[in-house]
Every structure is written in C-alpha cells, then in structure tokens.
Curated annotation (Swiss-Prot):
GO terms for cellular component: cytosolic large ribosomal subunit. This is Large ribosomal subunit protein uL30. CDD domains: Ribosomal_L30. GO terms for biological process: translation. It comes from the Bacteria. Keywords: Ribonucleoprotein, Ribosomal protein. Coiled coil: none annotated. The gene is rpmD. Part of the 50S ribosomal subunit. It comes from Nitrosospira multiformis (strain ATCC 25196 / NCIMB 11849 / C 71). InterPro entries: Ribo_uL30_ferredoxin-like_sf, Ribosomal_uL30_bac-type, Ribosomal_uL30_ferredoxin-like. Gene3D superfamilies: Ribosomal protein L30, ferredoxin-like fold domain.
Length: 62
C-alpha cells in the first residue's frame, strides 16, 4: 500500500522585483507567480532545497 506523500504549502510573501535571476527562476519552478500566491508541493529534498534558496521571499507550512 502506498502512503500519501507529505505536502508543504508555500506562499510568496515578497515581490520578486530586484531579486537575483536564479531566485526568480526558483520561485517560478515552485509555481509561484504573484505575491500572496500559494502552492502545495510534495515534501522532497529537492523542494526543500528550493525553499531554502528563497527563504527570504516565501513562507512555508507543513
């Protein structure tokens, strides 16, 4: 039987204007476009690394 993977809710709380191009690309990779947009993503090491990369722009909840 497979278990449901854990999800993390990620919300973009600061604007991407003036940030590094790589950080903008990371936010887009997570599916975040506008301020206050939220997505639920699977809890994987890759996703956690992306969140850590842009920690100052997002808020995350388990």
């Amino acid at each position: 039987m497979t278990q449901n993977p854990k999800k993390i809710k990620v919300t973009l709380v600061k604007s991407l204007i003036g940030t590094k191009q790589a950080h903008r690309a990371t936010a887009r990779g997570l599916g975040l476009r506008h301020v206050n947009s939220s997505v639920e993503v699977e809890d994987t090491p890759a996703v956690r690394g992306m969140i850590n990369n842009i920690y100052y722009l997002v808020k995350s909840e388990v």
